[in-house]
């Protein structure tokens, strides 16, 4: 895939990992998607480790997205990512302790920016403040950002466009990407990556799970 617009397939529905995640990945491992992940809840750790190991065996880049807002829970999520051998930790509210832990363990860290609350998450805050927050975290050495662009309570298109044009780091637009219209918007602003989870389970891109993955992959490559 190109340098940007990487599809991250999330084996999640309504911000929770589905129970049959392993089975779905097994069926779809030969799809065109190279980036795969899921959430920190509710699979037991041993099942998470088994699935990540199988993903890595199949040459995938792996993500754990942690939808937690306290330092303690965020750090627990980071520890889980390391224990599972994940490539990239997405989510958590930024804390220096999490950032330092990720650096020490060679885990790429892409925290949330802005005011993120609830589950499924929503994003609030002024666009300029969100961008300035990201710049501060970049100075502290984060790899990139988990931007909940389509969960934003303000001007979504302006946030996504302004954030990506102002931040020189990998940006993943995560959450609520559920139609070709949004894929076309993403093609225009060209983020490093985007996630799709629930929309695949709700058959928003027509076909089997694997067919939907390939439809999305091919659409953003056009």
Model-assigned labels for residue ranges:
Residues 71-83, 125-129, 159, 165-166, ...:
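Catalytic cores of alpha/beta
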Residues 84-97, 140-152, 176-177, 182, ...:
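Glycine-rich phosphate-binding active-site loops on the catalytic face of alpha/beta enzymes
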Residues 49, 124-132, 155-161, 209-214:
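Charged helix-capping and loop-helix junction motifs
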Residues 25, 52, 78, 99, ...:
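Generic hydrophobic/aromatic pocket-lining and core-packing "Φ" positions
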């Amino acid at each position: 895939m190109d340098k940007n617009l990487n599809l991250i397939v999330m084996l999640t529905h309504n911000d929770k990992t589905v129970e049959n995640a392993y089975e779905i990945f097994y069926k779809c491992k030969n799809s065109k998607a190279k980036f795969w992940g899921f959430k920190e809840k509710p699979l037991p750790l041993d099942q998470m480790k088994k699935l990540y190991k199988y993903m890595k065996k199949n040459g995938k880049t792996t993500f754990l997205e942690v939808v937690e807002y306290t330092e303690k829970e965020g750090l627990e999520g980071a520890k889980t990512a390391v224990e599972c051998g994940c490539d990239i930790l997405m989510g958590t509210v930024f804390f220096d302790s999490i950032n330092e832990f990720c650096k020490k363990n060679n885990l790429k860290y892409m925290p949330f920016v802005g005011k993120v609350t609830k589950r499924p998450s929503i994003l609030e805050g002024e666009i300029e403040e969100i961008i300035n927050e990201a710049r501060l975290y970049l100075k502290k050495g984060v790899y990139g950002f988990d931007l909940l662009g389509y969960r934003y309570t303000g001007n979504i298109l302006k946030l996504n466009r302004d954030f990506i044009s102002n931040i020189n780091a990998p940006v993943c637009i995560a959450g609520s990407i559920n139609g070709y219209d949004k894929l076309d918007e993403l093609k225009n602003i060209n983020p490093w990556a985007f996630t799709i989870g629930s929309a695949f389970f709700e058959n928003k891109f027509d076909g089997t799970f694997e067919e939907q993955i390939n439809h999305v992959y091919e659409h953003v490559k056009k």
